[in-house]
């Protein structure tokens, strides 16, 4: 059965105390060791189970005008492929609506390497996005 938004998962803004949950999703990455105990701001979107404390994915929004950004998409390992695809699609859709409401005229997006294909397909096919080039990301601790 196809996963259903609202029944099998919901997309919502992360609560300010959910930093440790996001840290767990980023396990074995360079950002795992940051201080995730500090209160989060409103820029994090999560896909979660509506009935139990189960977290599927996280995405960071950068609301800026005229170009907003979607960054750091991370999906929990081991979730079923269909659920993974639906979660990624709906998180992107939710995030684009939020950025449009903020006043962004365009959005750029970046994803971790193993999600590039899924992320790119959703942006291109569902939202008529255009690839703008290859990027190499860098992380600098402040």
Show where each model-derived region lies:
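Acyl-donor binding region in acyl/amide transferases
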Residues: 68-132
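Short amphipathic alpha-helix that is part of the acyltransferase structural core
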Residues: 1-35, 141
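C-terminal "cap" of GNAT-fold acetyltransferases
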Residues: 130-142
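Flexible, charged surface loops at secondary-structure boundaries
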Residues: 5, 38-41, 101-103
């Amino acid at each position: 059965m196809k996963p259903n938004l609202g029944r099998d998962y919901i997309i919502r803004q992360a609560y300010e105390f959910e930093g440790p949950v996001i840290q767990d999703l980023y396990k074995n990455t360079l950002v795992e060791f940051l201080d995730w105990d500090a209160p989060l701001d409103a820029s994090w979107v999560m896909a979660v189970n509506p009935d139990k404390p189960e977290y599927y994915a996280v995405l960071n929004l950068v609301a800026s005008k005229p170009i907003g950004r979607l960054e750091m998409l991370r999906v929990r390992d081991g979730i079923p492929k269909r659920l993974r695809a639906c979660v990624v699609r709906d998180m992107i859709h939710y995030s684009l609506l939020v950025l449009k409401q903020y006043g962004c005229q365009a959005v750029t997006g970046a994803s971790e390497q193993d999600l590039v294909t899924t992320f790119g397909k959703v942006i291109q096919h569902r939202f008529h996005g255009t690839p703008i080039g290859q990027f190499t990301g860098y992380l600098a601790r402040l």
